[in-house]
Every structure is written in C-alpha cells, then in structure tokens.
C-alpha cells in the first residue's frame, strides 16, 4: 500500500484530539519537562563553596589569626565554629556541623619566627569524597600561599614564575553551564519516550486496536500519524527548556539555534519511535511508561557522560555507552551552547542522530505491524 499524506494527517488529527482529552499526557508534555529542568538544574551542582569550617586556634597569636583570616577571606570557606579544645572536634564532624576542622597548634608563630616548619592539621569529613578532595585542595592552596608570604616576611613579592591560566567555554567554571545542556538531552529523551509509550497501549486498553487494525492504512502511516503530535509537543518543550537554560540559569547559547533544533528533531523522532516500539510490545499503559522510564532515564543518566566521565569508566561500559543515544545529543547541546561549534565539528553526532531516528522509526513500524497482524 502506498503511503498517503492525507491518511497520515487524519491519524495525526485523531491522536491530537485524544491527546487534548488526556490531562495526564498534557501535563507530562507541557509541565513536566520545564519542572524537571528547574528542579534538577537547581539541585545538581558540582560547585563547592562556602564550606563550613571549624577552627581550633591553640596559638592565639597575630600569625595564627592571619592564617584563619586567609581561610575566611578565600571565598571557599566560611568559619562557622571556633573551638577551644581537641575534644570538640569529633562531635562537630560526626554531626556534620562542619566539613573541615583546621587546628593551629601552640607555638605556631614561634616556629615561623625561628624559620622552622610550623605544622597545621586539617581534618576533613570524607563521607562525601568529592567535597572532601576539593576542600583539601583549597586548604593546601591557602596554606601554600600563606607559607610563601611568611617565608618572604609577609611581603607581597612577585614569584619568578606565574601560571596564567585561562578557561575556555565555561570561563567562570559554573557547574550549571555544564549540567543544563546535558539535562536538556536527558529530559527530552525521557519525556518523548514516556509520551508515545502510552499511545499504542492506550488503544489496547480501550479496545480500539482491532478497529485500527481493520482500517485500510499502512502501518507506517499509523506510526507517523501518532508520532507527529508528540513531535510538535517535543519541539515546544525543547524551546521552553532552552529558554529556561538561557534566562533562568544563564547558560550562553553561542552556536546556531537552527542546528540545535534540527539535531533535536532527529533525536526526538528516535525517542518517540522508541516509545511506540515499547508501547506496541507492552499492552499496559502503566507497564509501558515504567519500561520507557527504565529504558531511557538510567542509561541516559549513567552512561551518556552527563554525570560521569565516560573515559573513567571500565572498558566494557565505555563500549556500551556508544549505544546510548543521549551520549551523542549531549555532545551536541554542550557543543552548540558552550563552544558555538557547527557541522564541521558535530557531523559525527549528526550521523548518530540520523541513525537513531531511522532505527527508532523502523522498530516502531515493524513492532506495530507485527502486533496488528
């Protein structure tokens, strides 16, 4: 049977009418994506600042107070507890009232004056390994800078070698600039697959699948017709989350927005096709949405490079990550948002998006044809 645009759009209109009468799908399509971006965008942060610091100054001299002020004025630490004895250290760390305790022993100023090393102890809460590692690095930087000034008699003398570091693409090292473009890919895939995971299962539960199967239409027309309204919703969602990223989180969009939305269209088609494939195989709306969530959220979150560097994963997981579509779209969103790159850099990701859209549609059409036959 030859494909007919008239029949395809008739099915699309019918699906759009059903969608308007389904508050759950409307909420999932128009409210959930923005809510997820806002929630995860604020909750997920790798910025470590204002670390709660306890100080046990047993020397109580001008030099020890200068070191404490160096911690306080760094912008990395906030002195929230001033201790008077060693017994107070453990309870503070146990109750997580501070992340680190710096102990300046008595004789600190005398040791510096004599030109001998003056030990300073830093006890850090290692329950959060990432924060602990960063806090120790911050503390080492502060103490090294103070030590250099102390060795020079507290004079501001320029060192002979100065590293002039410059960060490209994310100049302020703001974690939201990295997180939000990645979140866009995760949210788009999860929501798209969730929406279409309901569509065929809904036909089974309402008993209208037999009527649909008896209709003289090609299975590709049914799949494309059911997919089209959700593609429109997905592109509206994409526009919404991009605007939220730019104007709420301040993420710069340095690249071509047309290229971003072209790539997003391919990514959405593949995700929507994946949802229809799941929906055709599983005839329960509840089970279909649960399966779609497990098939999209976990791999996209864990194996796409969104949260964890793929290069640090075991070789097997690195190989598996090549089959995760979100991996490629995250490279697209970060590349266009932060780097402003185009097709000369993103052509491989573009091919991956085309392959994903083709595979998603093929799986959807074949699974639907198998079910109605």
Q: At which residue positions do the language-model features occur?
A:
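Selective transmembrane-helix segments that form parts of the transport pathway or gating/packing helices
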Residues: 219-244, 261, 265, 350, ...
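Short coil/turn motifs that cap or connect alpha-helices
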Residues: 22, 218-219, 342
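Short hydrophobic alpha-helical segments within the ABC transporter permease transmembrane module
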Residues: 27, 31, 208-209, 222-232, ...
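Extracytoplasmic/periplasmic domains immediately adjacent to an N-terminal transmembrane anchor
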Residues: 1-177, 345
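Transmembrane helix boundary and interhelical loop/hinge segments in multi-pass membrane proteins
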Residues: 19, 96, 193-217, 227, ...
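Alpha-helical transmembrane segments of multi-pass membrane transport proteins
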Residues: 5, 60, 185-189, 233, ...
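Membrane-spanning alpha-helical segments of multipass transporters and channels
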Residues: 39, 60, 81, 91, ...
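Long, hydrophobic alpha-helical segments
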Residues: 44, 179-197
């Amino acid at each position: 049977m030859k494909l007919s645009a008239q029949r395809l759009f008739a099915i699309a209109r019918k699906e759009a009418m059903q969608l308007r009468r389904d508050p759950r799908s409307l909420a999932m399509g128009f409210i959930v994506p923005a809510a997820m971006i806002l929630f995860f965008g604020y909750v997920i942060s790798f910025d470590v600042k204002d670390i709660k610091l306890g100080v046990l100054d047993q020397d109580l001299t001008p030099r020890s107070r200068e070191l404490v002020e160096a911690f306080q004025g760094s912008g990395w630490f906030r002195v929230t507890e001033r201790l008077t004895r060693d017994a107070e250290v453990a309870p503070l760390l146990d109750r997580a009232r501070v992340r680190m305790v710096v102990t300046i022993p008595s004789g600190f100023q005398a040791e510096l004056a004599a030109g001998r090393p003056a030990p300073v102890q830093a006890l850090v809460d290692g329950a959060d390994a990432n924060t602990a590692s960063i806090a120790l690095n911050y503390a080492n930087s502060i103490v090294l800078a103070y030590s250099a000034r102390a060795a020079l008699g507290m004079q501001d003398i320029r060192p002979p070698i100065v590293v002039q570091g410059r960060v490209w693409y994310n100049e302020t090292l703001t974690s939201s600039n990295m997180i939000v473009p990645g979140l866009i890919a995760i949210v788009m895939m999860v929501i798209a697959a969730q929406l279409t995971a309901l569509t065929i299962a809904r036909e089974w539960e309402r008993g209208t699948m037999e009527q649909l199967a008896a209709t003289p239409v090609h299975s590709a027309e049914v799949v494309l017709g059911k997919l089209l309204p959700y593609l429109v919703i997905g592109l509206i969602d994409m526009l919404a989350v991009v605007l939220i990223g730019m104007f709420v989180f301040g993420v710069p969009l340095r690249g071509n927005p047309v290229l971003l939305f072209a790539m997003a269209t391919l990514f959405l088609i593949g995700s929507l096709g994946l949802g229809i494939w799941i929906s055709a195989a599983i005839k329960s709306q509840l089970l279909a949405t649960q399966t779609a969530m497990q098939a999209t959220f976990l791999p996209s979150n864990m194996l796409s490079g969104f949260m964890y560097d793929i290069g640090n994963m075991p070789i097997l997981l690195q190989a598996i990550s090549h089959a995760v579509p979100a991996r490629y779209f995250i490279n697209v969103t970060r590349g266009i948002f932060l780097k402003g790159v185009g097709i000369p850099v993103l052509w491989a990701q573009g091919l991956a998006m085309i392959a994903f859209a083709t595979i998603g549609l093929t799986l959807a059409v074949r699974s639907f044809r198998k079910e109605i036959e």
